[in-house]
Amino acid sequence: MCFPTDARPPLPPIQGGAIDARDLTLASVDGTAFAAYAARAEQPTGAGVVILPDVRGLHPYYEDLTMRFAEAGVDAVALDPYGRSAGAEKRDAEFEYEPHVLQLDGDGANDDVGAAAAYLRSADGGAPERMYTIGFCLGGRISLLQAASGLGLAGVIGLYPWPVGPHRTGLPAPADEARRFACPVLAMYGGADAGIPAEARDAFDKALDGAGIEHRTVVYPDAPHSYFDRKAADHADVSADTWRQILDFMGIGSA
């Protein structure tokens, strides 16, 4: 598991940061309904973000994260990747996600991101001027791949993504798709994450360099996998810098 079931983003609510947040059911291009959670910024900065969860799907962690983005002026929507196998019903933190992970496919994932981006670009979603994706672990891999999706993104962000080699879902490796990328990349890792060695990070950087893609790679030497968690008090400074890096990449200052 990427996070414990009680994990939450390491970002306290902003006092007085009123936002409009809601549960949604969106439809992919093939008609598949999937759950989502959206939050609109009261004071928009022109940025919008599609949030791609880790293997847990649309966990409360990501609902909280949409609100933290909105408080920072970023219209946000988090999607659940399991609409095709688990339906669009709202689920709790104890959801048994494992049977659904292997049923993911790249085309379906891309279609769902496209539907979420279309919602954000609508009047209901806030119609931001520039769009990003951000993902965590498995969602990080999917987020990086959106740089080749043709969605007209301003950038993609991956936190502790596996960027090279095969994946049990069959999703392609971002490094292998780098020559198709069409926007900047921000990739962030824990240096103490044994699951993503330096060789994997370096290979992705090399692929991006070879493709001429603007990119920023941030490695926090002592941070583990899934360090961006309120419970990880030892990594509070790292989490604070991560948030600053994310907002800077989106062209806005820290809230």
Question: Predicted segments — roles?
Answer:
Residues 1-255:
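N-terminal cap/leader regions of alpha/beta-hydrolase-fold enzymes
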